[in-house]
Amino acid sequence: MNPSVQQKLENLSHRFEEITGLLATPEVQNDQNRFKALSREYAQLEPCVACFRRYRETLEGLDHAQALLQDPDPEVRSLAREELETGRKRCDALEQELQILLLPRDPNDERNVFLEVRAGTGGAEAAIFAGDLQRMYSRYAERQGWRAEIVSESEGEHGGYKEVVMRISGQNVYSRLKFEAGTHRVQRVPTTEAQGRIHTSACTVAILPEFDDVEIDINPADLRIDTFRASGAGGQHVNRTDSAIRITHIPTGTVVECQDERSQHKNRARAMSLLQARILAAAQEKQNSEIAASRKLQVGSGDRSERIRTYNFPQGRLTDHRINLTIYRLDAIMEGDLDPVIDPLLQEHQADMLASLAGS
């Protein structure tokens, strides 16, 4: 292992021990902000420190096996050679794992997200597919132990959604979903197609990280806040109260709605959070076009040609065009089994980062 890398791992291990001690002190436990910050740092360091511990234990095992090669018993020497071969392979694997764990982290990886799906090219069929995508992501959230809730929705005339916004909360949500942003293309025979012809439609997906304390100054005078009656499920209650909220940020023309909660106060708070996320994403895009959270770079125009992924229902095939990944298990994927798609994307991203670091 490179000495500088080893020194960095030693420093991280010392910091981990320091944080472990601090978290046990009454001073930190009584300071919720500091306790939360240290707990977050602890969770970030733990996988790397645990892997480094296994690496050092494996090295100690190799030293022990190397010493046994001098044993007069030939059977012991044979076992030592086997142990050396196994240990060296394990060391190589752990060193590779440590390199990945040391890669710079996206500061948004641990954040909750607002996931937006919009029907693009394809009319009614695009709206139906938007509904299918919303359901797919909801099912995936369930599998991950996350919570998914619809913030706002505009239903399609024949089902699905013209637009739907979900808030997904849980552990490391953004890290798993950030590569879902872009144009998703579907090829299938619509239920309204009498001739049995395959149609091509498209939807756009945007992934916006949610910020707890957004450092962005929004002047209340720049906001127009409207209330209206919520539509959709909810029984008679939604017809009696103007609980839904629409907020317009006048300088940027950004409009957000929230009608998920029965409480107008909760809807307003959720809408403000979404507004902040959108404005910040737009500001980041303006400052740095390479930021992955940039919403306009994520979604494109919704044209079929700007695709990151194709869902071909007649063939039961999903193709991710960014990494030339093809999987023939579309039914399972649409039911939320997205790990076989997301994991290769993460691995490719890590490989690109490793190559970039090696090149520099």
From Swiss-Prot:
Localization per Swiss-Prot or TrEMBL: Cytoplasm
Any matching Pfam family: RF-1
Keywords: Cytoplasm, Methylation, Protein biosynthesis
Residues in coiled coil: none
One Gene Ontology CC term in the entry: cytoplasm
Keyword Cell inner membrane: no
N5-methylglutamine sites (modified residues): 236
Function description: Peptide chain release factor 1 directs the termination of translation in response to the peptide chain termination codons UAG and UAA.
Protein name: Peptide chain release factor 1
Provenance organism: Methylococcus capsulatus (strain ATCC 33009 / NCIMB 11132 / Bath)
Name of the encoding gene: prfA
